């Protein structure tokens, strides 16, 4: 009831606060027998962790994961898996000036109105730090999905503020702090962020994420649709203000002759649907895009009120990301993995014995003309990054 648990069969309960002793999660429903150790989880946490470049918060947390339960002799037991990440670099004194005031754009006011009190240290429970346990849980889901179904997840930044990032090469994504699939634009992004940081301002971003190898049939009718759960998961990420699946809002300007993904014996002709029809996966890539708002914690003074309702001016101290989108790629991948994992287990439970006389369609029919090896969107998609 408290909004800290995600999933039905692969169930993740998130706990902790930004400046508490530790954060973590409990995973219930992971199948037994999978080889699992901290080394399987740590790489994704390292991709998300703060202090890795001058363009993100300088809070320097090692984010070393500890497996406290649910694993015996290197294999999952089928019992709850508790993952712990200790906080080591809190600076709570930085928040002394906002004990009685509300930071515009933050959850300070809404938490206070709901609970009658709030933890001002780093945002407490509303901090983006609470995404670290979800990344850890997502790494567990990714491993099972990769081993059982061959499903993989890839995310990248497609826009930083008003700067579009044209897709060029997926191999470039892990080689720069922006997760940009285009090495040529990285110097421009670096200069943009340097100027932004000096001005004391912040900016938003757009992140794309895909799941490849998802079998057809995942998802439920009506209220447990796969795409509905994806949108729910993505909106649970801090600072996300919009979600698109497939062509998304570009569908408004498309005609039916453009948008409908034709089926051929050789496979689907396009993927405007983003891999989901009627709430159920088609066997194509799941194509998701999220919009992330500018960071609310900025050095520039902003008008607000205090707890008595009197006007005041807030200047935010502390260490903050000038663009939270820079570290959002592994978070979006993790949340998508958690949704797919949950639905894979649900499909196995209810429809695992369903057999059909013909094999599933190919995710994409063979191309008839020269095209990039890894386009930003599948043939037929009319949305722009």
Curated annotation (Swiss-Prot):
Binding site for NADP(+): 48, 54
Reactions the enzyme catalyzes: 5-O-(1-carboxyvinyl)-3-phosphoshikimate = chorismate + phosphate
Residues given in the record as FMN binding sites: 125-127, 238-239, 278, 293-297, 319
Pathway assignment: Metabolic intermediate biosynthesis; chorismate biosynthesis; chorismate from D-erythrose 4-phosphate and phosphoenolpyruvate: step 7/7
UniProt KW keywords: Amino-acid biosynthesis, Aromatic amino acid biosynthesis, FAD, Flavoprotein, FMN, Lyase, NADP
UniProt GO molecular function: chorismate synthase activity; FMN binding
EC numbers, comma separated: 4.2.3.5
Domain of life: Bacteria
Pfam families: Chorismate_synt
Biased composition (Low complexity): 363-372
SUPFAM superfamilies: Chorismate synthase, AroC
InterPro entries recorded: Chorismate_synth, Chorismate_synth_AroC_sf, Chorismate_synthase_CS
Family according to the record: Belongs to the chorismate synthase family.
Assembly and oligomerization: Homotetramer.
Record's function text: This reaction introduces a second double bond into the aromatic ring system.
UniProt xrefs under HAMAP family: Chorismate_synth
Name of the protein: Chorismate synthase
Organism whose genome encodes this protein: Leptothrix cholodnii (strain ATCC 51168 / LMG 8142 / SP-6)
Gene: aroC
